[in-house]
Amino acid sequence: MQVLVRDNNVDQALRALKKKMQREGIFREMKMRSYYEKPSERRAREKAEAIRRTRKLARKRAQREGFVSNGRTIAVK
C-alpha cells in the first residue's frame, strides 16, 4: 500500500494511509488473525455474518419500498 507525502505533511499522509487501510479491511483482518480460530468457528462466524448482511439488506429494501418505517418515532400532539 502506498501513500504520497506532499509538502512534507506526514500527518496528512498518515491519515490517508489509515483511511486506506480501514477501507481495505486490514485492521479487521489483523484483529482476526491475532489468535487462532478453529475452522468450524470460522464457518459459523462467516455464516452468521452472511445472515446479518442479508437481513440488513432486506430491511433496507423494505424500508426503501415503504413497507417498514425507518425506526424513528414521531411525537404527535
UniProtKB/Swiss-Prot annotation:
GO molecular function: structural constituent of ribosome
Source organism, top-level taxon: Bacteria
Keyword presence, Ribonucleoprotein: yes
Keywords, ordered alphabetically: Ribonucleoprotein, Ribosomal protein
Ribosomal protein listed as a keyword: yes
GO BP annotations, alphabetical order: translation
Pfam families reported for this sequence: Ribosomal_S21 (PF01165)
Record-level GO cellular component terms: ribonucleoprotein complex; ribosome
HAMAP family documented for this protein: Ribosomal_bS21
Family assignment from sequence similarity: Belongs to the bacterial ribosomal protein bS21 family.
PANTHER family the record matches: MITOCHONDRIAL 28S RIBOSOMAL PROTEIN S21, SMALL RIBOSOMAL SUBUNIT PROTEIN BS21M
Name the record gives this protein: Small ribosomal subunit protein bS21
Organism this protein belongs to: Bartonella tribocorum (strain CIP 105476 / IBS 506)
